[in-house]
Design a protein with these regions (language model features):
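N-terminal leader/transit sequences and adjacent low-complexity N-terminal tails
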Residues: 1-12, 21
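Intrinsically disordered cytoplasmic terminal tails of membrane proteins
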Residues: 2, 6, 208-214
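Selective recognition of hydrophobic, aromatic-rich stretches within alpha-helical transmembrane segments
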Residues: 7-8, 12, 51-81, 109-146, ...
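Interfacial aromatic "cap" segments that immediately flank transmembrane helices
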Residues: 15-45, 81-110, 124-175, 213-214
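Short, hydrophobic transmembrane alpha-helix segments
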Residues: 40, 44-56
Length: 214
């Protein structure tokens, strides 16, 4: 079943976080192996580069990998089947991903150094950076940061984002309770859920573009 695409400036009937969870589960129904494989690939590569040069590897490549992983999760939420090569798309636009990774990390870290609350505010406001960037890489890192902030705080969606963080935590804890094996399903599910949140925020925005759902 498809929802009608967003047209003009008519407000989009944004899914609730629980509806996003349900849609994400449905989107993964026949693609669990792909989603789990991509998540394991991301985890292994991230762990390897994180051990290089006291974290220098993560600084250098973390942005490109986040770009590619988020793109695969967005595609899964949209009912598409991402190719494994999509995971490495971030290296085609390496500089913007590096800048976005550094700026996001520094801003959030400064927020937590000052006080916990500013750190949480920054983390919520910049939570959509790599989703924006993977959709519009040609517009660069600065645009991605500003657009992420606009979609979350400026548009008044901060509680929805925070709610998704809490729901994701519950899903992860549920995976742990399932003899630990459930984590292999919970982790990609959470990744698709957070990608879906981005799509819902974007579609609900008066300046967003069309996306069709399955």
């Amino acid at each position: 079943m498809r929802r009608a695409p967003y047209l003009g400036r008519k407000p989009y009937d944004m899914r609730s976080n629980f509806d996003i969870l349900s849609h994400s589960w449905d989107a993964l129904r026949s693609k669990w192996l792909l989603a789990i494989g991509l998540t394991l690939l991301h985890g292994v590569i991230s762990a390897v580069i994180g051990s290089v040069g006291m974290g220098i590897g993560n600084i250098a490549l973390g942005g490109a990998l986040a770009f590619g992983y988020n793109r695969t999760m967005v595609q899964l939420y949209r009912g598409q089947t991402p190719a494994v090569e999509t995971y490495f798309d971030g290296f085609r636009t390496y500089l913007p991903t590096l800048i976005a990774f550094l700026l996001t990390g520094v801003i959030v870290l400064m927020g937590f150094v000052l006080l916990i609350i500013p750190g949480i505010i920054a983390a919520i406001g910049l939570s959509q950076v790599f989703y924006v960037l993977q959709d519009q890489p040609e517009r660069g890192a600065e645009f991605a940061l500003k657009e992420s902030w606009r979609l979350t705080w400026t548009n008044g969606n901060m509680w929805k984002v925070f709610g998704m963080m809490l729901l994701s935590l519950l899903v992860f804890l549920g995976g742990l309770l399932a003899l630990g094996v459930g984590v292999f399903f919970a982790t990609p599910l959470i990744s698709v859920m957070t990608a879906g949140l981005y799509d819902e925020l974007r579609l609900n925005d008066a300046q967003g573009g069309p996306v069709e759902f399955v």
